[in-house]
């Protein structure tokens, strides 16, 4: 064994061994308990970043630990390979998205191998290959036949200059990112999957997910947004149709003083024919894309349509306004306004001088003061005719019942959740498998024409999708009749909604899933990824699992038993102000810093001498230029050091602050482990350990070893507090470094201890542990070695610490045998100099003894 720890020499050797031996390849084995450990698959952007490394290290630690417990562990990896960034990169680098993507996959695969992750590479998949997306296309056609897929027009961002649809992130300040033309809202036909048909189940089954973070479950509950209320129909004077609104507060209905409709509502369109002000307002609304998050903060605007609706209970005429806070795609595109008891309605009514009518009493029973704001709390009704004096629940039911009896109301359960629009007007995605015949009939692509293959040899102009630009691509025949293919592609969330299931049978040719394999491995035992995926991906992931269950492919209700959301990786961020006042962000690697005595950064400059402003720790990002390249760190310290730091620096679900000093600390620790094993093995063979012949000191050290095994096992297995597990191993290492190594049993004990340490560290730092296990003459490869088991007998304390007090003041702490009697403890206490001093010449009036803990002598 060489004396120095040289990761650059051992890591590549161990990785080659794993490759050649196919160590992590698994198949179904009914005789073994399975464990499916999955990290969210990466987008092949070109290089791994520290967020990836953290995510995949956590997964690898768990997978290796479970493997050492003797389970059949599946840990696969693949590539979420479709998506918009590839199109931009292809234009920039004068290539096509496919070669750019495949090059990135090859590069990043090497980076993953360099970090020593134990993946079953035989199951690797890339979602951009026809072998993968053909089954997604087939499944979509099945969903269409089941009535779970439909087409309807929906608003998109449209650049009139480029004649193309833009994603929300391509709209900068209302203009096209490429040509700066003002973006319009345009209605185009798009495909939707009926996720709303599963809304109740998606909501209710959250209660089954005991091992998912509450934050994620709450976000999904709010996103699904189930509410109970009443749908109310209003007659409108001089208008051919009625208006329907939905409210969750029918108790406030007698305070409804106006209605508001979306700018795109047919009533507003009709009114605009003779109202130029309204027409201009509708135009303005059409071209403002409003995300729901911005709705709350934006200025509320509206125009009176001139139409009057009739309040069904009071018979009063109330105005109908067009307002920018009502969205056509939500509900009916019309809302009832109760400005006395809804703050948004109140602000709008105050701005435009509309009637505000209070109908709910304040908590103290007085009439509410509406001079500053609405009263939004529930309470007792007044000013409401026959409903006066009713509380919220009674009023809700009474008004709902009356409206229902009159035929103008209906109790309804509503959802915030909208159906999933899966059409994208981009090129680099899976083609949607639908065709249109010459007579306008729309139908699914027949099975014998699947997959609909996306051509990869294309020229990107950065504007139009190549399959939209080439009229020949869309032409096909179905049942001998000419037809046109759909030129939209799937939302890339489609591919990531079912990949976890395809990993169980990536080569399966007969269908989407081999149910036997899928049901052996599924559900996933632990799924690891960022909390930013809480609603979109993790909701579609759950939805797809239920769709596959209802298609008879899987036999479970939920895709993953446990979800672990790892924290973000933060790093120092610095900038200097340029000549034009712009911020130039400087990589922390290039910052020369001065620190105070507490280690805080007080001054910084770069190599060019710019004074740098230090903005603290923030998420590693391109925009702040504060990402640290994992590859550079691995080349400098070795993969094991980077992995150990990642797991030690912070609990897995909290943010991690990147500190190179911490990385150096992790590296020093591994050097210490190496050195101790080197010194131990240099002394030659070791005798067998005889636990019955150990001295008190040897027993105490062995107790520490086995207590550490018990703690680390609990920390990794049950608590998943990996940082405290590592801390416990480090503490044990400090004791081992000071332990005597001269006697035969000293060395036998050291052998047992080091074999335990190396196995406990193996999930974190597998390369060094693989090597040290061989040096310690461990049986077989460490990859197949069992996890160490704590010896209960070794952990039993044979002595205990007793605190000795005289008149309640601590005078000594003594070590006594566990089974010592009170007399023996008193006798031993009397031998202590300080205790004897305070007992000299006085009478012991009372003795308080708590066995094994406390002896208090009361003297007078």
From Swiss-Prot:
**What Pfam families does UniProt report for this protein, alphabetically?**
Anticodon_1, tRNA-synt_1, tRNA-synt_1_2, tRNA-synt_1g
Listed InterPro entries: aa-tRNA-synth_I_CS, aa-tRNA-synth_Ia, Leu-tRNA-ligase, Leu_tRNA-synth_edit, M/V/L/I-tRNA-synth_anticd-bd, Methionyl/Leucyl_tRNA_Synth, Rossmann-like_a/b/a_fold, tRNAsynth_Ia_anticodon-bd
Keywords attached to this entry: Aminoacyl-tRNA synthetase, ATP-binding, Cytoplasm, Ligase, Nucleotide-binding, Protein biosynthesis
An example of a GO molecular function for this protein is: aminoacyl-tRNA deacylase activity
Binding positions (ATP): 622
The record, for CDD domains, names: Anticodon_Ia_Leu_BEm, LeuRS_core
- Quote the catalytic activity from the record: tRNA(Leu) + L-leucine + ATP = L-leucyl-tRNA(Leu) + AMP + diphosphate
Q: Where is this motif: 'HIGH' region?
A: 42-52
Give the EC number(s) under which this enzyme is classified.
Answer: 6.1.1.4
Q: Read off the SUPFAM superfamilies from this record.
A: Anticodon-binding domain of a subclass of class I aminoacyl-tRNA synthetases, Nucleotidylyl transferase, ValRS/IleRS/LeuRS editing domain
* Protein name as catalogued: Leucine--tRNA ligase
Q: Where, per UniProt, does this protein localize?
A: Cytoplasm
Q: Where is this motif: 'KMSKS' region?
A: 619-623
> What is any one of the record's Gene Ontology cellular component terms?
cytosol
Q: Name one GO biological process term.
A: leucyl-tRNA aminoacylation
> NCBIfam families given for it?
leuS_bact (TIGR00396)
Disulfide feature: none
Q: Which family does it belong to?
A: Belongs to the class-I aminoacyl-tRNA synthetase family.
